[in-house]
UniProtKB/Swiss-Prot annotation:
SUPFAM superfamilies: ALDH-like. Substrate binds at residues 118, 171-172, 299-301, 453. Keywords: Cytoplasm, NADP, Oxidoreductase. It catalyses: D-glyceraldehyde 3-phosphate + NADP(+) + H2O = (2R)-3-phosphoglycerate + NADPH + 2 H(+). It is found in: Cytoplasm. The gene is GPN1. This is NADP-dependent glyceraldehyde-3-phosphate dehydrogenase. The active site is at 266 (proton acceptor), 300 (nucleophile). GO terms for cellular component: cytoplasm.
């Protein structure tokens, strides 16, 4: 029995179309239009959401601006209390939200539930961390700088930016919405959420949990619609004071149009896995399979290219192939390891990379197999730098192996990429691992583990085309605030008294 849009969530559904949320109410768009969300498994329309107009975006922004002023004056402990309540409601209603993730983005059922629970934990932790971070200020006295007496005291604290525009990606529409919503709200900001089309209904259910928690009217909005209609309008809106975006190269275009608005962006990666001769090959093979093929490789932090020393390449490829043969391929409802990729266009793009590699002589460790959006796991050996898949991000269950003859060769390939999100190194020599880590031009390097985002309080950032700024709970709270200073001027130096 379907759980989405029923029970406490019934009010977010208008017939067959999910409403959008603005000014504390669930609304039907005046456009009279809707956007279809196609189930990646059935390739049929699963849900519909409102196609909001630019005027409706304007009204949401106006309401956010008004609500934010009052919210910023709300005591910090009260903000935290409402966030804790929202987190509890979110976890209580994990089943219908997880159902949406299964049907919208083909996320395996067990992983869908885990994402919702993780999102609730993230929001609670954010509330706790926010009380600590924002509850502290800084005092600086003037005589610490040469030539000054102690006649000035500078008190600095963090204040909200205003209205945060949050744009999460399809692959983690709940968790990466929570990672933006929580920090924005605890810091005293208002928030306008523009969810991805695939994942929009899960996001709407999530927003309703915040509605049920009792956040002030207008503080949170969730607008849905076509990017061609409201995408640029949102990102260039004069009412936006901060943009937090996770996704692909659309973010580069946003950054060029954003002007003076602070940006937090994670835009993908080509995460390299460098394997040295002394590595634990069982550990390596397990992490290559987990890192490269979890959620069908549709993760920014997935292993995207394996750079392995020639002397151990055959052994590692053999171990990886044995593990790939055991993966369950099928629909997400069956908790399959490999599920359909999110859209037909994504599957076509992946196939294009595979065919290019085939034409240029890559070794296919498995037969290439595709049914609709479902692509079976494929390891490509003897990949060369002239193949597209050596550089482009497939975002699917296809992984290239490049054989190298030196550590320097592996580092060079990693650093030649226009991406720089994460990378990983497998070796028993910690000294060598640190040296390689320092040489890799990535935001994070994992030693003896596959790339990963999290735990959610860890710093998470990319270099080059992989992003701007840093995420993680503490970093996000700091990014969504600005420093306000008050200087107390004394008529005479304070240490003359007493």
């Amino acid at each position: 029995m379907a759980l989405a849009g029923t029970g406490v969530f019934a009010e977010i559904l208008d017939g067959e179309v999910y409403r959008y949320y603005a000014d504390g109410e669930w609304r039907t768009s005046a456009s009279g239009k809707s956007v279809a969300i196609v189930n990646p498994t059935t390739r049929k329309t699963q849900y519909r959401v409102q196609a909001c107009t630019q005027e409706e975006v304007n009204k949401a922004m106006d309401a956010a601006k008004v609500a934010q002023k009052a919210w910023a004056r709300t005591p910090l402990w009260k903000r935290a209390d409402v966030l804790h309540k929202a987190a509890a409601i979110l976890k209580e209603h994990k089943a219908p939200i997880a159902e949406c993730l299964v049907k919208e983005i083909a996320k395996p059922a067990k992983d869908a539930v885990s994402e919702v629970v993780r999102s609730g934990d993230l929001v609670s932790y954010t509330a706790e961390e926010g009380v600590r971070i924002l509850g502290e200020g800084k005092l600086v006295v003037s005589d610490s700088f040469p030539g000054n007496e102690r006649n000035k005291y500078c008190l600095s604290s963090k204040i909200p930016l205003g209205v945060v525009l949050a744009i999460p990606p399809f692959n983690y529409p709940a968790n990466l919405a929570g990672s933006k919503i929580g920090p924005a709200l605890i810091a005293g900001n208002a928030l306008v959420l523009k969810p991805p089309t695939q994942g929009a209904v899960a996001a709407l259910h999530m927003v309703h949990c915040f509605h049920l928690a009792g956040f002030p009217k207008g503080l949170i909005s969730c607008v849905t619609g076509k990017g061609s209609e409201i995408g640029d309008f949102l990102t260039m809106h004069p009412g936006v004071n901060c943009i937090s975006f996770t996704g692909g190269d659309t973010g580069i275009a946003i950054s060029k149009k954003a002007g003076m608005v602070p940006l937090q962006m994670e835009l993908g990666g080509k995460d390299a896995c460098i394997v040295l001769e002394d590595a634990d090959l069982d550990l390596v093979s397990a992490n290559i399979v987990k890192g490269g093929f979890s959620y069908s490789g549709q993760r920014c932090t997935a292993v995207k290219v394996v750079l392995i020393m020639e002397s151990i390449a055959d052994a590692v490829v053999q171990k990886v192939n044995a593990k790939l043969a055991k993966l369950k391929v099928g629909p997400p409802e069956d908790d399959s390891d490999i599920t359909p990729v999110v859209t037909e266009s994504s599957a076509n793009f992946i196939e294009g990379l595979v065919m290019d590699a085939k034409e240029k002589g890559a070794t296919f460790c498995q037969e290439y197999r595709r049914e609709g959006n479902l692509i079976w796991p494929l390891l490509l050996d003897h990949v060369r730098p002239d193949m597209r898949i050596a550089w482009e991000e497939p975002f699917g269950p296809v992984l290239p192996v490049i054989r190298i003859n030196s550590v320097e060769e592996g580092i060079h390939h990693c650093n030649a990429s226009n991406f720089g999100l994460q990378g990983c190194i497998f070796t028993r020599d910690i000294n060598k691992a640190i040296l390689i880590s320092d040489a890799m031009e990535t935001g994070t390097v994992q030693i003896n583990s596959a790339p990963a985002r999290g735990p959610d309080h860890f710093s998470f950032q990319g270099l080059k085309d992989s992003g701007i700024g840093s995420q993680g709970i503490t970093n996000s709270i700091n990014m969504m605030t600005k420093v306000k200073s008050t200087v107390i001027n004394l008529p005479s130096p304070s240490y003359t008294m007493g």
